[in-house]
């Protein structure tokens, strides 16, 4: 059952709010960077009169970002960016704080897009997106609103790729800041965050030991790098599957084996996809896999593993581990285990990235929203990098919160770095 008050909220259970408040408080206590930004926002109110529409994984860390934007004067409407990642307790708690929340765990595809439409019905000035579903939706279903949107931010690699495609085709109608492409995002969130949280979700769902297992990581971008290194740290034998020769060479130099999926399919005990592309594990690969193989996806959308093949070719389908694992029994007796329906494993089966990592990423989001509020009307449609001063400021705030001081260049060193006369 879902409790709906149109124009205000649509959530699973308002009585879950006390637990949600506790979850948010714990996250808030471990997010000092956003805390520092929130204090400034409370004083300066840079978002006064701005409505922010958000499509993010709706959980405790996201709630702290919502609070930060509201402290700056924004009105917020939010929904989830994945049908299985919403924490119903947090949704209930945010409603009590006056947030327009339209999300619950286990949405159908129709409900998922209906909730995005509900957010867009608030006519947001700025959109904060994860995966670009909301940005794409406002262009296709709300074209008049798209003309009035000041700008947007995008959290993920997958979303940024979609936005570049929109811009190439000439359909993107407002500026979007690619938060994903900031150094403090991809070096920390994509690598350390995904590396830890993807394996955490896998282990929560299965309770298996990784030591001694052969783990195949599909994709060696920043997310794949993090997963591969954390899996090795837990004692796994790691194989990397890549299409990019430079990334493949890096994986080799990092000490991993590299091979095509056809060969890796025969060796792997566990497969984790992290490509942002579709059909990277297909039926012909599944046919070669071992009995008891485990498949998990760390990419944004559930298109990396061929679920249709499993559904169409299995003789029996069984829910395991409280629904976190689906067992497919194939005609030859082989068992294939799919984690969280092939959706984002770290959030569908776990609690997402560590709090301290999202403190950094959401600080980038908050400051990027501020940039759009101040400068967005003068920016042309397109995909923009996070301003360097914002990227640097987030790193400075994080280091300050950790009590870390940096060395400083002397005047002579600064002058030397600008000169060309001195040589050997």
Curated annotation (Swiss-Prot):
Keywords (A to Z) from UniProt: Cytoplasm, Hydrolase, NAD, One-carbon metabolism
Pathway(s) per entry: Amino-acid biosynthesis; S-adenosyl-L-methionine biosynthesis
Pfam families, per database record: AdoHcyase (PF05221), AdoHcyase_NAD (PF00670)
MF terms in GO: adenosylhomocysteinase activity; trialkylsulfonium hydrolase activity
Database matches in InterPro entries: Adenosylhomocyst_ase-like_sf, Adenosylhomocysteinase-like, Ado_hCys_hydrolase_NAD-bd, NAD(P)-bd_dom_sf, S-Ado-L-homoCys_hydrolase_CS
PROSITE patterns recorded: ADOHCYASE_1, ADOHCYASE_2
Top-level division of the source organism's lineage: Archaea
Localization of this protein: Cytoplasm
Cofactor, how bound (note): Binds 1 NAD(+) per subunit.
Cofactor: NAD(+)
Reactions that this protein is recorded to catalyse: S-inosyl-L-homocysteine + H2O = L-homocysteine + inosine
Gene Ontology cellular component terms for the protein in this record: cytosol
GO BP terms in the entry: one-carbon metabolic process; S-adenosylmethionine biosynthetic process; S-adenosylmethionine cycle
EC number(s) on file: 3.13.1.9
Additional information: SAH is a product of SAM methyltransferases and is known to be a feedback inhibitor of these enzymes. As a result of this inhibition, organisms have evolved efficient enzymes to metabolize SAH via different pathways. The pathway found in methanogens differs from the canonical pathway, it uses the deamination of S-adenosyl-L-homocysteine to form S-inosyl-L-homocysteine for the regeneration of SAM from S-adenosyl-L-homocysteine.
Function description: Catalyzes the hydrolysis of S-inosyl-L-homocysteine (SIH) to L-homocysteine (Hcy) and inosine. Likely functions in a S-adenosyl-L-methionine (SAM) recycling pathway from S-adenosyl-L-homocysteine (SAH) produced from SAM-dependent methylation reactions. Can also catalyze the reverse reaction in vitro, i.e. the synthesis of SIH from Hcy and inosine.
PANTHER family: ADENOSYLHOMOCYSTEINASE (PTHR23420:SF0)
Family statement drawn from the similarity comment of this UniProt entry: Belongs to the adenosylhomocysteinase family.
Protein name as annotated: S-inosyl-L-homocysteine hydrolase
Organism, as annotated: Methanopyrus kandleri (strain AV19 / DSM 6324 / JCM 9639 / NBRC 100938)
């Amino acid at each position: 059952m879902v409790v709906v008050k149109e124009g205000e909220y649509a959530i699973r259970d308002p009585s879950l709010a006390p637990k949600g408040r506790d979850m948010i408080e714990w996250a808030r206590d471990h997010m000092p960077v956003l805390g520092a930004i929130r204090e400034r926002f409370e004083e300066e109110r840079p978002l006064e009169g701005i409505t922010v529409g958000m499509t993010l994984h709706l959980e405790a860390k996201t709630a702290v970002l919502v609070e930060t934007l509201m402290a700056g004067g924004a009105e917020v409407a939010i929904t989830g960016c994945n049908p299985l990642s919403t924490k119903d307790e947090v949704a209930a708690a945010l409603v009590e704080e006056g947030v327009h929340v339209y999300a619950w765990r286990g949405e159908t595809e129709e409900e998922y897009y209906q909730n995005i439409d509900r957010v867009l019905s608030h006519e947001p000035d700025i959109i904060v997106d994860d995966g670009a579903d909301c940005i794409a939706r406002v262009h296709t279903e709300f074209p008049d609103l798209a003309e009035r949107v000041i700008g947007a931010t995008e959290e993920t690699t997958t979303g940024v790729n979609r936005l570049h495609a929109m811009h190439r085709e000439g359909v993107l109608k407002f500026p979007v800041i690619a938060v994903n492409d900031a150094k403090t995002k991809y070096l920390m969130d994509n690598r350390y965050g995904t590396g830890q949280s993807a394996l955490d979700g896998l282990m929560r769902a299965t309770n298996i030991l990784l030591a001694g297992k052969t783990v195949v990581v599909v994709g060696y971008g920043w997310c794949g790098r993090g997963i591969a290194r954390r899996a090795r740290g837990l004692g796994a034998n790691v194989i990397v599957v890549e299409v990019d020769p430079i990334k493949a060479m890096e994986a080799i130099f990092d000490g991993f084996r590299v091979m095509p999926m056809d060969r890796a399919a025969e060796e792997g005990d566990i497969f984790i996809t992290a490509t942002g592309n579709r059909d990277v594990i297909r039926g012909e690969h599944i046919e070669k896999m071992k009995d008891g193989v485990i498949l998990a996806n760390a990419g944004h959308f559930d298109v990396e593993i061929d679920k249709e093949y499993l559904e169409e070719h299995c003789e029996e389908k069984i829910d395991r581990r409280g629904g976190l694992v689906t067992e497919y029994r194939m005609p030859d007796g082989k068992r294939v285990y799919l984690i969280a329906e092939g959706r984002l494993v770290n959030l569908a089966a776990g609690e997402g990235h560590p709090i301290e990592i999202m403190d950094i990423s959401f600080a980038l989001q908050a400051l990027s929203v501020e940039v759009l509020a101040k400068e967005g009307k003068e920016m042309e449609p397109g995909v923009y990098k996070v301003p360097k001063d914002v990227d640097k400021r987030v790193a400075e705030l994080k280091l300050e919160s950790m009590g870390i001081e940096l060395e400083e260049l002397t005047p002579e060193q600064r002058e030397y770095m600008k000169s060309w006369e001195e040589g050997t």
